[in-house]
């Protein structure tokens, strides 16, 4: 309590002095400004406490002094302010003082009022501070304070200032940021002077746990590392260190809202009330007294008194040597500080590894403090984790089994085929379905082994090292081509001896056209042929395709013989096809010229066209091109359904009925008989398509293609002649040349006959074209076009005949009148018979209407 009263008294006096100083400055503002230069005093090892810059507002907390940074003087203010202050303090002009004598009572009243207000505000602030500190003190900290001896209560409070003064003196020339903080705080740029200069100097905060675990862990840590027994074994500054530790407990457990106000007052106490020589701790060398690591902080900022500690090296060694006490189920106490902060302490006996708690963020100003480099460093091994999940157990077991297998000299696991999936990370804090799954890895390796890796062990087998790889070293043909040849040979089911005998004798019937075509496809290139001929090794080293081609190439001009034999095998079929095609063309010309029904249809179209073109330039025509037949279906009647082709078909049907009808005069024909005759006439018209079947087949031919086939046969004869010229160069296979010589004579005769048939067919086609088109035959680009036109017309005629057969004598009356007027050879009936016939016909037509 005495330090608190001293603090309040000092603050009151400072406020009065500040108000008085402000009044003096205000009275000398009219004085001229003199450029007074200010020289900063040299920095000393023992820092002097700077005068705090208090505000007259009691609600604003005082600016704390950083004990962790260097204790340097603040930078000088501008020259104008320094001149005013220095002039006012050194003694203003007597005229100014004399002139202000009249305002002394007013100034005294103002000073007294301000002092009274400041005292009241400070008393209220002190009461609130004490009340808040008592309520916010953690129960565990209060219990630790209660267990202290009675003598330590005052010793700790009295040695706080000494400890902080020592720490401030040790870190005077460390931080360059100490120079600008008072100026920034004076200008109001920042309220907290403890701002960390760079975020890279501050490590990441640990993972947060529950509030209860943190609170319990904090109390355990305080009880383990800040005990009176440990302080008694230290140096003379142990009391100060204990006081600092007690203050850290209160600051760490206090709420966040009161951190700024509580952070500033203890630093002021240590700065403005220096300790006596008896209470001041003995300064220890930097190499013997490194600061211990603070407990895990509750926030990102560390309170001022928890940044440094005044403990000695012996105290730290004692803490590291003594194992931590076994706590209740709460988390274990924190480990000793890291080795980078203790690299100057002597090496103690190795302590048992304590459990590692979550590491809090290290203060940035501690990182800025230079650490000596000499002395061995202590490396504290970390204890293994206490809790192991199920999946970690399974993974560890699997890895251990694989490690033992590899250590025992087993073969490496083969590479399997990949499975592309979306990998999900399993959680270690909950039970999942994947923890219960088991796989048969041996079966997976058997089923899904990669072929490239599966072949490698077999190739490296020492039993097969001595055997040469014939398929890779002795292969001549392309692998794909050799495989195709082997497949063809198995499909044809023929032996090598049969092929060689047929080639030597020239017997094409023995092999057949299919096998000869396959041999032509097997023909190697010139490079492959040279390799096969020059091969002198063991034939068993070659594949089946290479052995077959090697045996065939041993025959002179083997593949030329194959071409000639294939020509001979196909010659007869090709000649027969050409002869049949030419005969079809001649038959089509004869059928088209001699068809009576086709000529009658042309007559009906000509008469109808002349009747429709009366009075025009197209009228009175004597002939028309057959292409007009394709336009009959485009001319439609008034009803929109009946076309000109329908009408022509009906007229041809009735004309056929009239020829088959042989009734006497004045005889009324039976309606059923007329219908029957009508159907017969329709069959006759529809039979035109069958009658001109050769025309349809001729329309599918191309005369240029037929001429190309004939030319190909003649070229084949030239190949036979060239092979026969090689007879003198061959010592074997004489029967082949004799057989080919006989075939050549027969083939020449056949080709001459085919040439004659071709000319005859072409002449007949030109003749039939002139028969229908006259001199327009010269305009035809395609010689067989006339057959294609007739074929298309016949398909249209069949379609119309099917439609007419479905109708029920729709145009009987109009067709009969047209028939009577057109056929003059029919007998003229008397009026009565004609009327009776008309009545009967009308009666027969009425039901159908």
Curated annotation (Swiss-Prot):
Protein name as annotated: Formin-like protein 4
UniProt biased composition (Basic and acidic residues): 185-194
Membrane topology value: Single-pass membrane protein
Source lineage: Eukaryota, Viridiplantae, Streptophyta, Embryophyta, Tracheophyta
UniProt entry tagged with the keyword Disulfide bond: no
PROSITE patterns: FH2 (PS51444)
PANTHER family: FORMIN-LIKE PROTEIN 4, FORMIN-RELATED
Compartment(s): Membrane
């Amino acid at each position: 309590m005495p330090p608190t009263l001293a603090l309040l008294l000092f603050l009151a006096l400072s406020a009065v002095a500040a108000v008085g100083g402000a009044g003096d400055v205000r009275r000398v503002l009219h004085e001229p400004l003199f450029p007074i230069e200010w020289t900063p005093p040299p920095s000393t090892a023992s820092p002097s406490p700077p005068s705090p810059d208090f505000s007259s507002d009691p609600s604003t907390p005082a600016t704390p002094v950083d004990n962790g940074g260097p204790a340097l003087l603040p930078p000088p203010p501008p020259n104008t302010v320094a001149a005013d202050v220095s002039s006012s303090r050194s003694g203003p002009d007597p005229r100014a003082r004399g002139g202000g004598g009249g305002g002394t009572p007013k100034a005294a009243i103002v000073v007294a009022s301000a002092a009274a207000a400041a005292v009241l505000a400070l008393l209220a602030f002190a009461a609130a501070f004490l009340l808040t500190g008592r309520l916010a003190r953690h129960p565990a900290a209060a219990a630790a304070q209660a267990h202290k001896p009675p003598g330590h209560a005052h010793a700790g409070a009295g040695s706080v200032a000494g400890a902080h003064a020592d720490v401030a003196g040790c870190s005077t020339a460390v931080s360059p940021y100490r120079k600008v903080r008072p100026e920034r705080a004076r200008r109001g740029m920042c309220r907290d002077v403890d701002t960390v200069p760079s975020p890279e100097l501050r490590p990441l905060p640990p993972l947060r746990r529950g509030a209860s675990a943190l609170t319990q862990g904090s109390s355990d840590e305080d009880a383990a590392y800040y005990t009176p027994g440990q302080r008694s074994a230290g140096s003379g500054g142990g009391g100060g260190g204990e006081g600092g530790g007690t203050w850290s407990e209160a600051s760490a457990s206090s709420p966040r809202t009161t951190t700024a106000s509580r952070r500033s007052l203890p630093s002021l106490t240590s700065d403005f009330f220096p300790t006596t020589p008896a209470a001041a701790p003995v300064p220890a060398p930097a190499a013997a007294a490194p600061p211990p690591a603070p407990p895990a902080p509750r926030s990102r900022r560390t309170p001022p008194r928890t940044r440094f500690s005044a403990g000695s090296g012996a105290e730290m060694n004692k803490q590291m040597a003594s194992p931590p006490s076994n706590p209740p189920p709460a988390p274990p106490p924190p480990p000793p500080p890291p080795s980078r902060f203790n690299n100057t302490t002597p090496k103690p006996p190795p302590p048992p590894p304590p459990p590692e708690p979550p590491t809090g963020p290290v203060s940035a100003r501690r990182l800025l403090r230079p650490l000596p480099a000499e002395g061995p460093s202590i490396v504290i091994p970390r204890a293994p984790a206490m809790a192991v999940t199920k999946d970690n157990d399974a993974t560890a077991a699997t890895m251990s089994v694989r490690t033992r297998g590899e250590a025992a000299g087993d073969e490496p696991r083969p590479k399997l085929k990949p499975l592309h999936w979306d990998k999900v990370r399993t959680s270690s804090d909950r039970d999942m379905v994947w923890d219960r799954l088991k796989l048969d890895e041996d079966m997976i390796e058997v089923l899904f082994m990669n072929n490239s890796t599966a072949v490698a062990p077999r190739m490296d087998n020492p039993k097969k090292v001595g055997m040469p790889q014939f398929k890779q070293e002795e292969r001549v043909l392309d692998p794909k081509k050799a495989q195709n040849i082997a497949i063809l040979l198995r499909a044809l089911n023929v032996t090598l001896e049969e092929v060689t005998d047929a080639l030597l004798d020239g017997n094409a019937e023995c092999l057949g056209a299919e096998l000869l075509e396959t041999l032509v496809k097997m023909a190697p290139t010139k490079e492959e042929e040279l390799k096969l001929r020059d091969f002198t090794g063991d034939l068993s080293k070659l594949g089946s395709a290479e052995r077959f081609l090697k045996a065939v190439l041993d025959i002179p001009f083997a593949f030329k013989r194959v071409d000639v034999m294939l020509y001979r095998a196909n010659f007869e079929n090709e000649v027969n096809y050409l002869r049949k095609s030419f005969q079809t063309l001649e038959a089509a010309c004869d059928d088209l010229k001699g068809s009576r029904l086709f000529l009658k249809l042309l007559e009906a179209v000509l008469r109808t066209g002349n009747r429709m073109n009366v009075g025009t330039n197209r009228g009175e025509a004597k002939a028309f091109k057959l292409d007009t037949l394709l336009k009959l279906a485009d001319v439609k009647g008034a009803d929109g359904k009946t076309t000109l082709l329908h009408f022509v078909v009906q007229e041809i049907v009735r004309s056929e009925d009239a020829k088959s009808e042989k009734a006497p005069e004045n005889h009324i024909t039976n309606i059923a008989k007329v219908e029957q005759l009508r159907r017969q006439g329709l069959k006759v018209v529809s039979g035109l398509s069958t009658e001109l079947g050769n025309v349809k087949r001729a329309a599918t031919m191309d005369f240029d293609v037929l001429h190309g086939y004939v030319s190909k046969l003649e070229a084949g004869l030239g190949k036979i002649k060239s092979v026969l010229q090689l007879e003198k160069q061959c010592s074997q296979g004489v029967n082949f040349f004799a057989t080919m010589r006989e075939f050549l004579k027969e083939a020449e005769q056949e080709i001459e006959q085919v040439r004659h048939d071709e000319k005859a067919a072409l002449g007949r086609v030109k003749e039939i074209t002139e028969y229908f088109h006259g001199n327009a035959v010269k305009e035809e680009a395609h010689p067989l076009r006339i057959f294609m036109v007739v074929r298309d017309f016949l398909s249209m005629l069949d379609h119309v005949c099917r439609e007419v057969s479905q109708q029920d004598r729709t145009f009987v009356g109009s067709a009969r009148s047209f028939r009577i007027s057109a056929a003059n050879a029919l007998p003229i009936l008397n009026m009565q018979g004609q009327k009776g016939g008309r009545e009967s016909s009308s009666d027969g037509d009425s039901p159908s209407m």
